């Protein structure tokens, strides 16, 4: 469930929608390639409210107005989740409930919500307009934000959330809907839902209102029609591969990548007859050769890659692959949507481990994949079968984390670039891998397709395995851990952290030397991090 597109699933009289913030954001830098439906300036939808915030006309509780306003976010969300109804027949409620409904009707009379349907592929149900995609609200074209909300930082804060607030709560934050299933008042409603005449949620594995908000937020940042959230980045990668590559198919991937992704491609996909060509990230000739010699279904790579931060020319490889009918999926975890817009560069799909920069606080596991509705729907269908659904509490943590995404990424970009330059000049550092450095083999590509170079720097210490471990142990600020992208700095020695089960010679086949260090810069003060790294280098 990515983008809520039920234009009038419930009457609008109880919505406090802000028209200036409704829907997605126009991505003016995205070519008209069918990957995102961007509205012209002449057509717009105002006041469109996300489904969880619309209250059906018979939704009442015997609460005073004051009590309703004081409901907690979670409590209100649970009440909302339990009250989906389009039944227009109203029983005889108490005077208090009637007073609340009267107040709601009066408020709506003062500020009615104007909803203009822009999607012609709709069904009319009891004077309500709802798309025919059932509860998978992916078919709505992007909506227009206010002109002053055109920066990624503002979008990361507001996208998907200021889509309308019910009068029960004036909460700024998005509620957490903790439920495993959603009920129907009567069988006729269930039949309408099954026959796609009524929009609703059904089961927790298929979608959650809190998760929808996060999917809309990520879609707005990526300029995507649809986004699907999953329980981890690896879940997103594996489900994408299983959904889009047929049995007996062929993919192209790169030498430098996350090891677990490589293991899945090398050991699991062959069981379905799927083969792979592995190329250097910069070897365009090898890609062309594979495209000409084989029926390639998909090109899948990271950019920047893990751990050497190699960069793929996304625009070029997308052009080459599309000419041969192959799809392109870019794992942009190291870049973030703020530093790189893979879809705008021509990729069909962009994937993230939201555990990293998007969540940004080292406290949640999640993955996401964004792109055109058709492709994401294919992945979604398999995901609903396999499971791996994201818990709504985890979705809330990422929503909260993304409100500071632009601040964190700006700090991490700056710290990483400055430290990369210092490390490159240090006599106890043999080599530095960072796309922001002119010495990086794909620096020219990174400059072309990235606005910032990320918060991770890899480098080789002048020493062996034990000397490098001594350097790591001498650091005071970063944690020794296997992740990156959070507020806290993290350091690891890949030869030990990720490849310790392989011999030194086998590690070397992947370029993993004993003296390699991967440093993820957090948001600590630059001078503190600089002093810590320099003292650790002085200790070896």
Curated annotation (Swiss-Prot):
Its cofactor is pyridoxal 5'-phosphate. Binds 1 pyridoxal 5'-phosphate per subunit. The modification N6-(pyridoxal phosphate)lysine is found at residue 356. One of its GO terms (biological process) is transsulfuration. It catalyses: O-phospho-L-homoserine + L-cysteine = L,L-cystathionine + phosphate; O-succinyl-L-homoserine + L-cysteine = L,L-cystathionine + succinate + H(+). Pyridoxal 5'-phosphate binds at residues 203, 205, 233-234, 258, 353, 355. Keywords: Chloroplast, Plastid, Pyridoxal phosphate, Transferase, Transit peptide. It is found in: Plastid, Chloroplast. GO terms for molecular function: cystathionine gamma-synthase activity; pyridoxal phosphate binding. Irreversibly inactivated by DL-propargylglycine. Its EC number is 2.5.1.160. Forms homotetramers composed of 2 homodimers. This is Cystathionine gamma-synthase 1, chloroplastic.
């Amino acid at each position: 469930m990515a983008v809520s597109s039920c234009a009038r699933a419930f009457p609008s009289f109880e919505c406090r929608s802000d028209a200036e913030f409704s829907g997605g954001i126009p991505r003016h830098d995205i070519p008209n390639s069918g990957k995102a439906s961007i509205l012209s300036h002449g057509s717009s939808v105002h006041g469109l409210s996300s489904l969880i915030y619309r209250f059906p006309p018979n939704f009442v509780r015997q609460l005073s107005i004051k009590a309703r306003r004081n409901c907690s976010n979670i409590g209100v969300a649970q009440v909302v989740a339990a009250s989906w109804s389009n039944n227009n027949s109203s029983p005889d409620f108490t005077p208090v409930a009637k007073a609340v409904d009267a107040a709601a009707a009066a408020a709506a009379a003062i500020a009615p919500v104007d909803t203009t349907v822009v999607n012609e592929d709709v069904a009319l149900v009891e004077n309500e307009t709802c798309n025919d995609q059932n509860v998978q609200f992916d078919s709505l074209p992007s909506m227009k934000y206010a002109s002053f909300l055109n920066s990624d930082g503002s979008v990361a804060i507001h996208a998907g959330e200021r889509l309308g607030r019910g009068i029960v709560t004036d909460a700024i934050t998005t509620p957490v809907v903790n439920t495993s299933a959603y009920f129907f008042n009567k069988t006729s409603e269930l039949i309408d839902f099954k026959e796609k005449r009524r929009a609703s949620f059904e089961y927790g594995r298929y979608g959650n209102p809190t998760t929808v908000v996060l999917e809309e937020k990520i879609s707005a940042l990526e300029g995507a029609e649809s986004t699907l959230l999953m329980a981890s980045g690896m879940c997103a990668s594996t489900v994408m591969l299983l959904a889009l590559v047929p049995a007996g198919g062929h993919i192209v991937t790169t030498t430098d990548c996350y090891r677990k992704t490589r293991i899945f491609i090398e050991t699991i996909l062959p069981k379905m007859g799927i083969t792979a060509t592995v190329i250097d990230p910069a070897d365009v000739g090898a890609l062309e050769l594979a495209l000409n010699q084989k029926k390639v279904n998909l090109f899948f790579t990271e950019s920047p890659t893990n751990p050497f931060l190699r960069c793929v020319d996304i625009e070029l490889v997308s052009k080459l692959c599309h000419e041969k009918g192959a799809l392109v999926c870019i794992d942009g975890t190291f870049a973030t949507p703020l530093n790189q817009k893979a879809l705008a560069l021509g990729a069909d799909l962009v994937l993230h481990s939201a555990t990293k920069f998007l969540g940004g606080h080292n406290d949640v596991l999640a993955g996401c994949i964004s792109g055109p509705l058709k492709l994401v729907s294919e992945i979604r269908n398999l995901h609903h079968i396999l499971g791996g659904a994201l818990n709504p509490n985890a979705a809330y943590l990422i929503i909260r984390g993304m409100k500071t995404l632009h601040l964190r990424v700006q700090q991490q970009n700056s710290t990483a670039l400055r430290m990369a330059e210092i490390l490159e000049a240090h006599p106890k550092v043999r080599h530095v891998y960072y796309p922001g450095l002119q010495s990086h083999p794909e620096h020219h590509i990174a400059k072309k397709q990235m606005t910032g170079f990320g918060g991770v720097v890899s480098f080789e210490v002048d020493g062996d395995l034990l000397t490098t471990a001594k350097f790591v142990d001498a650091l005071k600020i970063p944690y020794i851990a296997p992740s990156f992208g959070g507020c806290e700095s993290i350091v690891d020695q890949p030869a030990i952290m990720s490849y310790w089960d392989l011999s030194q010679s086998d590690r070397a086949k992947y370029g993993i030397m004993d003296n390699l260090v991967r440093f993820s810069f957090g948001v600590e003060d630059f001078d503190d991090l600089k002093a810590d790294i320099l003292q650790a280098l002085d200790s070896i």
